[in-house]
Amino acid sequence: IFKRLCEKAKINDNFDEIVVNSDIPVIVDFWAPWCGPCKMFAPIFNETSKKYPLKAVFAKVDTEREQTLGSKYHIMSIPTLVVFKNGREVKRVSGALDPLRLSTLINEFI
């Protein structure tokens, strides 16, 4: 989901275009519906995204539905958070983060 976050279809159909053309960091949560840690992290990611409405774009990519994106970005474990800035991957963190660690990560790039 891209919610400033965009709609699911748009993020998946236009992922590369959105990442490359964004003038602000893009924070992507690669996840799957069956993943317990992903379910625990989802509300943290969603709530934290509301704190940065114009400073970062937040996206969720379901690696089950979008296997091509998961493969392209070499997602080996989930959840994996990938930060893109100026169209390039600048940081990657695997595993669920607590709210403070997530905010610290975001603040590194805004």
What are these regions (language model features)?
Residues 1-7:
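N-terminal targeting signals for export/organelle localization
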Residues 8-25:
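A short beta-strand-turn-helix
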Residues 23-25, 42-61:
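Conserved helix-turn-beta segment immediately C-terminal to the redox Cys motif
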Residues 23-26, 31-34, 77:
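Short pre-active-site segment immediately N-terminal to redox-active cysteine/selenocysteine motifs
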Residues 30-44:
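Conserved redox-active cysteine motifs that mediate thiol-disulfide chemistry
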Residues 61-71:
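Structural microenvironment flanking redox-active thiols in thiol-disulfide oxidoreductases
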Residues 77, 82-110:
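Non-catalytic, surface beta->alpha helical segment in thiol-disulfide oxidoreductase systems
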